[in-house]
Amino acid sequence: MQLSLRLSAIAGLVTRGNRLVDVGCDHGYLPVSLYLDGKIPGAIAMDVRKGPLSRAQEHISQYGLDAYIETRLSDGLEALKPGEGDTLVIAGMGGPLMERILTDGAEVRESFREMILQPQSDIPHFRRFVRKIGWQITEEEMVLEDGKFYPMNIGRAHV
C-alpha cells in the first residue's frame, strides 16, 4: 500500500511492536499499511463520522485484516478504554480540536506510551499544551507535501 508522504512520515515515527490507536482515521490507510509492513500487531481505527469509518472498514476488509484492525465510531477518545493501545496517532486536525480530544480523554491519554501528533493549526499553543499536560516532545519531523508544511511531534510521558 502506497502512503502519502505525510502518512509515510507518521508511519515512520510509530514504535515497532506497539498497538496503534488512530483517531480521525479517515480511510484507514495508516493502520493497514503499518500492519502489512509487520510494524504493529494490531490497531483500533476511530473516526467521529460514519462515512470515513465505513471507508476504513472497507480497506481493512479488502486486505483481510478484520481480525487485527478494529474500527470504532468515536468522538475523540470516548470509545476507548485505558490500556487498549500503546501509540496514539492524531493527525490532520487543528490544534484546538486535538487539545479538546486530549483533554476530554485525559484518563485514556495517560495510558499511552507515545503520542504522534500532527496539528494543522495553532502549533505553538498546541506545543505548550502538550508540555502542560506532562508530556515531552522527544522528536519532530517536518514534511512538505502539495505545497504545505506538516509538522509532526512524538510526545512521551514521564521522560
Pin down the residues of each PLM region.
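Conserved alpha-helix/loop element of class I SAM-dependent methyltransferases that forms part
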Residues: 2-17
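Conserved SAM/SAH-binding beta-strand->alpha-helix loop
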Residues: 49-51
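Glycine-rich SAM-binding Motif I of class I
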Residues: 28, 32
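Conserved class I S-adenosyl-L-methionine
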Residues: 17-26
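S-adenosyl-L-methionine
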Residues: 54-83
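C-terminal substrate-binding/active-site "lid" region of AdoMet-derived donor-dependent transferases
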Residues: 104-153
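Conserved small/polar residues in nucleotide/adenosyl-binding loops
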Residues: 157-159
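Conserved SAM-binding motif I beta-strand of class I
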Residues: 42-47
